[in-house]
Amino acid sequence: MSRIAKYPVELPKGVEASIQPDQITVKGPLGTLVQSLTGDVNVAQEDGKLTFVVANDSRHANAMSGTLRALVANMVTGVSKGFERKLNLVGVGYRAQIQGDAVKLQLGFSHDVVHQLPAGVKAECPTQTEIVIKGPNKQVVGQVAAEIRKYREPEPYKGKGVRYADERVVIKETKKK
């Protein structure tokens, strides 16, 4: 059995989990998330905890038990607390603003970039050069942040571009004669 899967996932107050043979659904104050299950891992709910047991003794089943436990733990955290990712816009004239369910970005192009947000994801702009992406699904929040960053990745000479708040951009030295 995977070392990660040995530990049960505790369900905090306000979070419910329902287990069907092919999927697990986690409901909480911030939304509902669904994860498909494989036949290699059995999930049981007892005393407000979810336990993961390997159905057969294959290497694949062992690996899937740890993966599934981590995914479900992220689902429980997401529907109770949520996830957020912060982006900074570094550059002269780089700005962001929220327009309904989209983020409008001015990134030095001749046109504005409008990025549509998927369902369940919210964005805030505390300042014109900061974007905070929030949502219950960790994968989707990270994906949206990566897509926005992809429009103008930080360049290595001046550091201009869209970067994660915790990202360190290593600045290269320019070529000398």
Swiss-Prot record:
One of its GO terms (molecular function) is structural constituent of ribosome. InterPro entries: Ribosomal_uL6-like (IPR000702), Ribosomal_uL6-like_a/b-dom_sf (IPR036789), Ribosomal_uL6_a/b-dom (IPR020040), Ribosomal_uL6_bac-type (IPR019906), Ribosomal_uL6_CS (IPR002358). The keyword Glycoprotein does not apply. Disulfide bonds: none annotated. GO terms for cellular component: cytosolic large ribosomal subunit. GO terms for biological process: cytoplasmic translation. It holds the Pfam family Ribosomal_L6. Signal peptide: none annotated. Transmembrane segments: none annotated. Keywords: Ribonucleoprotein, Ribosomal protein, RNA-binding, rRNA-binding. It comes from the Bacteria. Belongs to the universal ribosomal protein uL6 family. HAMAP family: Ribosomal_uL6_B (MF_01365_B). PANTHER family: 60S/50S RIBOSOMAL PROTEIN L6/L9, LARGE RIBOSOMAL SUBUNIT PROTEIN UL6M. Part of the 50S ribosomal subunit. This protein binds to the 23S rRNA, and is important in its secondary structure. It is located near the subunit interface in the base of the L7/L12 stalk, and near the tRNA binding site of the peptidyltransferase center. This is Large ribosomal subunit protein uL6. The gene is rplF.
